[in-house]
Amino acid sequence: MQVIGITGGIGCGKSAVLNMLPDLCKCMVIEADKVAHEVMKKGQIAYEAIVKEFSTDILGKEKEIDRKILGNIVFSNEEKLAVLNSIVHPMVKTRIKESIEEKKKEGLLDFIFIEAALLLEDHYEEICNEIWYIYAPFDSRKQRLIKARGLSEEKILSIIKEQRSEEQFRRDCDKVVDNGGSIEDTRKEIVKLLENIEHQ
């Protein structure tokens, strides 16, 4: 079983790639964001550490962490965001490692795909056989983000500027998937990558 990391900047179409993968191979797709939601739930591994750090003011109904309140605190304060990430990210990675081990024992899958915005920063190369960079040119990304999220060009530029550059992604990833054309072109490219791995 191969573990493949999926990463790329905002608007590169990572979700579209993730959605097509289960039709192309026997796989499981793990999204780090969804795992983060899980570990932050009441009774889960990150809950107490987050409440201790940010106080019970962040709790909403049923004493669950209110992600909106927490978001308002951390996204205007880099220091607090770094603290939150230092709590959540290692726990997410641990939970993902556990899932991988579980699936390896079951032996039913050929691939596990892990998608995380900070895949490289959080050193997922330690648990991945390969990391794929989902690439799309700026104009494609811009159109997607205007359409899907209603963002202004100025806002899009400021988000992209904060993220890893295309050169850095290309340098640090093993494979590049060009997602700037049609969905069918992307699909063909992924099929080819999967076949290459299976024939190794």
Tell what function each PLM region has.
Residues 12:
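ATP-binding Walker
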Residues 96, 125-126, 147, 151-200:
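Small-molecule kinase domains that catalyze NTP-dependent phosphoryl transfer to phosphate-bearing small molecules
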Residues 97-106, 111-148:
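ATP-dependent NMP and nucleoside kinases share a basic, alpha-helical "lid"
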